[in-house]
């Protein structure tokens, strides 16, 4: 019988642990990975090119569909880039709403990551627990924009509308008793801020539940400790950002180091790892959820006591209200022009970056003075992380590759763009 030393394995794109459409060619020697070669491009939708063929204000919806687990953070970078070009700033209330929803999005993303990561490694209960809390936050998206995922809520100059005075309620159903229904709708009787405040009171207890399931779990630790180790120097060289960089021990967070909107007005800490392995990155993200909860609390408190406009009054950029349009011909003209040809920006180039849940999500935009961008370049954090897959997986077992993909928090919408 002919002996062979190494063989190749196709991992994905149909593999359940491949997180979407990842195809990886693994060169194996027995159970050990000798080389990992990720193949990208299976979800390429030409988002950058599409954004270059439409007026500025008509591409916001595309941003939601990049990293489709942290929707509003993508919008934030795009909207900030346009605001920089125009030289405008959103009203302070709109900035607080944006920061609050960025942090709600961060929790949404990390819950999805934790559930999927647990499921990949074999811990199914965490997945079910995480989706219980995600449901409440999805309802916040729905209340404010009408959509559970692709909100298209941010606008250059503010947000689409102020926070609603009520929350969506569960309808009577033959599958639920009256008592169950009352319990499910108990927190939904007041305003949206009441609902979010109730969530922030409950959420730390939920995070404790996840930690009870996983943090000291013997199997969980055996699967994550000393797997996918990246040193601080190497993490910088590879272009890591977000929890991947902080997990390696580098305290870099755009919300603190280059604050945007009102991040310089809220208090929070930056969790940092020590070993740079999968387990450290898990601990960093768990602590990030607690810090996000803390920021949301501060935003809710400020928004309660400070009413005000959530959109610029300049109708050359921001559309007038429906009420104004019914009476005022000039407002109708503004509305028509905004939604047909949009607005022009001065020639120039800008880069706006936000601390998205996965890392630094940036939008580099070049304007030639027209009503649509000459060039839009999107900087996806997952791209740099996936590029390091070969280095992180080499020498590990095949089963550890799944843990490494999970710890990188890969979503292909932003990588393939």
Swiss-Prot record:
**UniProt cross-references to Gene3D superfamilies, sorted A to Z:** Cytochrome-c3 Hydrogenase, chain B (1.10.645.10)
Top enzyme category = translocase
> Which reactions does this protein catalyse?
a quinone + NADH + 5 H(+)(in) = a quinol + NAD(+) + 4 H(+)(out)
InterPro entries membership = NADH_Q_OxRdtase_suD, NADH_UbQ_OxRdtase_49kDa_CS, NDH1_su_D/H, NiFe-Hase_large
**Gene Ontology cellular-component terms listed:** plasma membrane
Q: Which UniProt keywords apply?
A: Cell inner membrane, Cell membrane, Membrane, NAD, Quinone, Translocase, Transport, Ubiquinone
Q: Please explain the role this protein plays, according to its UniProt record.
A: NDH-1 shuttles electrons from NADH, via FMN and iron-sulfur (Fe-S) centers, to quinones in the respiratory chain. The immediate electron acceptor for the enzyme in this species is believed to be ubiquinone. Couples the redox reaction to proton translocation (for every two electrons transferred, four hydrogen ions are translocated across the cytoplasmic membrane), and thus conserves the redox energy in a proton gradient.
Q: Which family does it belong to?
A: Belongs to the complex I 49 kDa subunit family.
Query: What name does this protein carry?
Result: NADH-quinone oxidoreductase subunit D
List the source organism.
Alkalilimnicola ehrlichii (strain ATCC BAA-1101 / DSM 17681 / MLHE-1)
Tell me the organism's taxonomic lineage.
Bacteria, Pseudomonadati, Pseudomonadota, Gammaproteobacteria, Chromatiales
